[in-house]
UniProtKB/Swiss-Prot annotation:
Family annotation (PANTHER family): 3-DEOXY-MANNO-OCTULOSONATE CYTIDYLYLTRANSFERASE, 3-DEOXY-MANNO-OCTULOSONATE CYTIDYLYLTRANSFERASE, MITOCHONDRIAL
Name of the molecule in the record: 3-deoxy-manno-octulosonate cytidylyltransferase
Pfam families with a match to the protein in the record: CTP_transf_3
Species assigned in the record: Chlamydia pneumoniae (Chlamydophila pneumoniae)
Family annotation (NCBIfam families): kdsB, PRK05450.1-3, PRK05450.1-5, PRK13368.1
InterPro entries on file: Cytidylyl_trans, KdsB, Nucleotide-diphossugar_trans
Presence of the UniProt keyword Cell wall biogenesis/degradation in the record: no
Family, similarity comment: Belongs to the KdsB family.
Reaction(s) catalysed (UniProt annotation): 3-deoxy-alpha-D-manno-oct-2-ulosonate + CTP = CMP-3-deoxy-beta-D-manno-octulosonate + diphosphate
Entry function: Activates KDO (a required 8-carbon sugar) for incorporation into bacterial lipopolysaccharide in Gram-negative bacteria.
EC assignment: 2.7.7.38
Major localisation: cytoplasm
A single cellular component GO annotation: cytosol
Lineage of producing organism: Bacteria, Pseudomonadati, Chlamydiota, Chlamydiia, Chlamydiales
Length: 254
């Protein structure tokens, strides 16, 4: 452990798995000349509240690549079943004083760092919050109907009730707001390690959504509504969509 690691109080962890069932080798996929993981890392590094960014992986190719572009990566156990378990291993081994641990999914190359900061601020300002995650309003029918996009419903106090790949809520008669979940989780340390002690759950397995494991064991997830909605990479065909998004952003500034 490096001395500066032990002193970090707020860290960002980017889980990056090589053998993704949907897209093997995804972290190194090129997007306009830069890898997916490099773009995600560089965007996260713009956060004003994270003391350290670290890639958590199970593959030496990713370690070498992150080191080559000047990032920081560590090897985690191949037995980790999801990104949150990988995040927890990093926090336990390398950052014993970290009070807030942000799990930033490695497939969010266009994530605005202001989203990360908003989660950290909400976690710090709300004593009852133990896990905060962002959602964004959508009116796009394709996004609402596809199983690739996770939807979230929450109560009047901003506490998540459920996450699903199905369209929720069901729209019966009139237009109802639909919120998409963005794959970032800001944990208080105690909540993260409590999650790691929980066994897998039926709904989490059925939907293939790790956050449901936290809900099913009685945990409370607070949502943070954000304006920033950007494309993620789940399948090879998503690369072209992300490249188009980046091109449109570039054209808007020049």
């Amino acid at each position: 452990m490096k001395p500066e690691e032990s002193e970090c109080l707020c860290i960002g962890v980017l889980p990056a798995r090589w053998n993704s069932s949907r897209y093997p080798g995804k972290p190194l996929a090129k997007i306009h000349g830069k890898s997916l993981i490099q773009r995600t890392y560089e965007n996260a590094s713009q956060s004003s509240l994270l003391d350290k960014i670290v890639v958590a992986t199970d593959d030496q190719h990713i370690i070498d690549h992150v080191t080559d572009f000047g990032g920081y990566a560590v090897m985690t156990s191949p037995t980790c079943s999801n990104g949150t378990e990988r995040t927890g291993e990093v926090a336990r081994k390398y950052f014993p004083k970290a009070e807030i641990i942000v799990n930033i999914q490695g497939d969010e190359p266009c994530l605005n760092s202001e989203v990360v900061d908003a989660l950290v601020q909400k976690l710090r300002s709300s004593p009852e919050a133990e896990l905060v995650t962002p959602v964004a309003l959508t009116t796009d029918r394709e996004e609402i109907l596809t199983e690739k996009k996770v939807k979230c419903v929450f109560d009047s106090e901003g506490r998540a009730l459920y996450f699903s790949r199905s369209p929720i809520p069901f729209i019966l008669k009139k237009a109802t707001p639909v919120y998409l979940h963005i794959g970032v989780y800001a944990f208080k340390r105690e909540a993260l390690f409590r999650y790691l002690q929980h066994s897998s759950t039926p709904l989490s397995d059925a939907e293939d959504l790790e956050q449901l494991r936290f809900l099913e064991h009685g945990g409370k997830i607070h949502v943070c509504i954000v304006d920033a909605k950007s494309p993620s990479v789940d399948y090879p065909e998503d690369i072209a969509k992300v490249e188009q998004y980046i091109t449109c952003l570039s054209n808007a500034y020049f």
